[in-house]
Regions:
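Hydrophobic anchor at the beta1->P-loop junction of P-loop NTPases
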Residues: 3-5
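P-loop (Walker A) phosphate-binding loop of NTP-binding proteins
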Residues: 8
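Conserved lysine of the Walker
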Residues: 13
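Hydrophobic positions on the alpha1 helix immediately C-terminal to the Walker A/P-loop
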Residues: 16
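N-terminal phosphate/diphosphate-binding loop that engages ATP/GTP or pyrophosphate donors
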Residues: 22-84
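Residue-level signal for inorganic ion chemistry
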Residues: 32, 74, 103, 117, ...
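Small-molecule kinase domains that catalyze NTP-dependent phosphoryl transfer to phosphate-bearing small molecules
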Residues: 68, 107-114, 121-126, 130, ...
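ATP-dependent NMP and nucleoside kinases share a basic, alpha-helical "lid"
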Residues: 78-81, 85-153
Length: 221
């Protein structure tokens, strides 16, 4: 079985996907981390992120390590890719059709055998439209901004999100949403047969319980 979890930044995809994967003993694949890692690697190789063909070459040659942490070509980038700057870099990289073509193919290889919880923005709509369980997580703009401010603070090695950063993060999220929803290749969208879950004010345990119920129903003969 493959479980597809989509949604915008700050909707809770990562926490929910990791928890479900642990409970089911499935592999967890964060496809957003792959785009971020490629952006990080290309930048450190001195490649212009606006050059889609060059960045696609990085994606094609990349050796990923997604087992608990995020690695690319021998570099552990788990924390380095969780910054506001990398949010923008990943958005730039994700708009290139050539990059998406390469990474979608690699993601399909990862999920083809099943036993995977895959999260991203186009899993249920493009990568695995035939997935038996498709979830779309969302939350209010304020809730998402608070979560992302906290996450990027942790990624930068800070103890917590500063209150005055939340507004800045909210603006960045608005720009990222526009980029994700209007890009020509695999835009962020709710797949017609996906289950929409609003996580605003809802605990992780409650969301996980909803998803696990869906998984149980899909497994029934």
């Amino acid at each position: 079985m493959l479980i597809a979890i989509d949604g915008p930044s700050g909707a809770g995809k990562g926490t929910v996907a990791r928890t479900i994967a642990t409970q089911l003993k499935f592999r967890h694949v964060d496809t957003g981390a792959m785009y971020r890692a490629v952006a990080w690697r290309a930048d450190h190789l001195g490649i212009d992120l606006a050059d889609g063909l060059a960045v696609a070459g990085v994606a094609e040659r990349a050796v990923f390590d997604l087992d608990g942490r995020v690695g690319i070509d021998g570099h552990d980038v788990t924390s380095a890719i969780r910054t506001t700057a990398m949010d923008a870099a990943a958005a730039t990289v994700a708009r290139h059709p050539d990059v998406r073509r390469v990474l979608v193919a690699r993601q399909r290889d990862m999920g083809r055998a099943g036993g995977v919880v895959m999260e991203g923005r186009d899993i249920g709509s493009v990568v695995f439209p035939e997935a038996p369980v498709k979830i779309y997580l969302d939350a209010s703009p304020d809730e998402r901004a608070r979560r992302r401010a906290r996450d990027t603070s942790h990624g930068a090695g800070q103890a917590g999100a500063e209150p005055d950063r939340v507004g800045q993060v909210a603006q960045a999220l608005e720009a990222r949403d526009l980029s994700d929803r209007t890009r020509a290749a695999s835009p962020l969208m709710l797949a017609p047969d996906a289950v929409y879950i609003d996580t605003t004010g809802v605990s992780v345990d409650e969301v996980v319980a909803q998803v696990m119920d869906l998984v149980a129903n899909r497994r029934l003969p």
